[in-house]
């Protein structure tokens, strides 16, 4: 009798609708409609067992929900269903009834332990118990519901809707894990409650719940389909309404009756949702599940926002220009922006850097009285060299340093570059590149005008006025302009010597200014680390000043003999020696190494 009792009970319930053939489904509906009292009595006895197992399984599910096992088990059960529903549909349709007996006997004592079913299913020739159950589920769903959709929906959905209140407290926790087993208990408890409460209250529930199902079913049909990717268009046209109603009741009972079931379903549903489209489910699921699922992509998006910030930090095309990240970022973004505000910002920054003694040479070219001319022509030189594109904003920006005599001394070597650009266009590419490479002027403030002057003096008397103009620009002092007209070559040494001496003076000034501004001292170590070539370039200027004392004239004369051949190469090599000097400078290499480098460049011969 228990098997027969299980038959009508389970047939009325969904698992047999899943498992049995259409004949089973018809018998289930007929048994429910016809002999409702007797079936309710049998089901009441079974439900007692079911309730015991539900309590046990709920405890186990809570433990598993904490450990996350229940969610893991529910997903594989759903995934194989989608893959194996069709092949087993053909195989297991004739076996529906004998399987239904075995499977329904199992779920009553064993709801959570679906894997315990495989021995019985293997006896029938099935593959895996957990997989065979969902296979049978799809058979019953696709076939029985199509044929007896109206009958099954009316009684089964009524009983399931009415009585899912109690059993789904435990079964909702089981969720997708025991979808096959969820309906039998609701139908069985439905029988208990119907036996006690009689039929009219379920009818009232029918009137209320079909509305809810009509409302909630459309969002949850896709949601459940996402939980178990299966042939839902075929299977769950009527059946989706049942489980939608069940799930809707579960949601309502979750919020109203028992909140702990929410804790059970939440761990189960988020994995299924994460693996599957969550839109419809998020609509139907309780609010507790939505934020947990939606917040994870939001956090991921926040993490995505971080890498662009890192990219902005890492975007250091102007890194060697200003090794400091904030300087580089502002220079890049501000090149496109208005130059005036950028110039003001850079002026303040460069004043601090000048106090540190790091990028003073960079600040100097803008200090020129020819700021506008230098900026315009450096902009012209921008297409020539990308490093030059960084220079134009800089020369225009810091006019503040011009007030300092040390800055004026430093301006002298680089002013030669800017007026040279304006006066002698033949030298523009050669000399515009050094302003682009600000460190070059520091490292080689003297040799650049040397080469130009030697080339001019070497080749023709025409470059002599250029030399005078260059020298006038080189000292950066209008007094030196007069001297340069007379001294020409020696003026190079004098101007460079004065600039080097004045560089020594600003170094003292930088120390005093550093004492004045201790916060710059804090900034200084990082600036030195990032821009080691520049402090070394200052050292190179000092070292080169030692050469200037009595060696520049001889070196210039040697270069004068060399440079006719280097006229064409001056474009290439004038940018190169400062680059090499910058590389040599951070090491603080003595003059001998510098001379060797100059010899390799062909600028010096001893």
Swiss-Prot record:
Which residue ranges have biased composition labelled Polar residues? Answer: 68-81, 141-157, 312-331, 558-568
Cellular location(s): Cytoplasm
Region of interest called Disordered, as start-end residue ranges on this chain: 64-488, 500-543, 555-574
Q: Positions modified as Phosphoserine?
A: 130, 132, 397, 412, 524
* Keywords noted in UniProt: Cytoplasm, Phosphoprotein, Receptor
Q: Which InterPro entries match?
A: SARG (IPR026152)
- Report the GO terms under cellular component: cytosol; plasma membrane
According to the UniProt record, list the residues that bear Phosphothreonine: 334
Q: Tell me the superkingdom of the source.
A: Eukaryota
What coarse category fits the chief subcellular location reported for this protein? cytoplasm
Biased region (Basic and acidic residues) positions are 206-224, 233-260, 344-354, 451-465
Here the segments flagged for biased composition (Low complexity) are 265-277, 381-399
Q: Which family does it belong to?
A: Belongs to the SARG family.
Q: According to its UniProt entry, what is the function of this protein?
A: Putative androgen-specific receptor.
Can you say what this protein is called?
Specifically androgen-regulated gene protein
Organism of derivation: Mus musculus
Q: What gene name does this entry carry?
A: Sarg
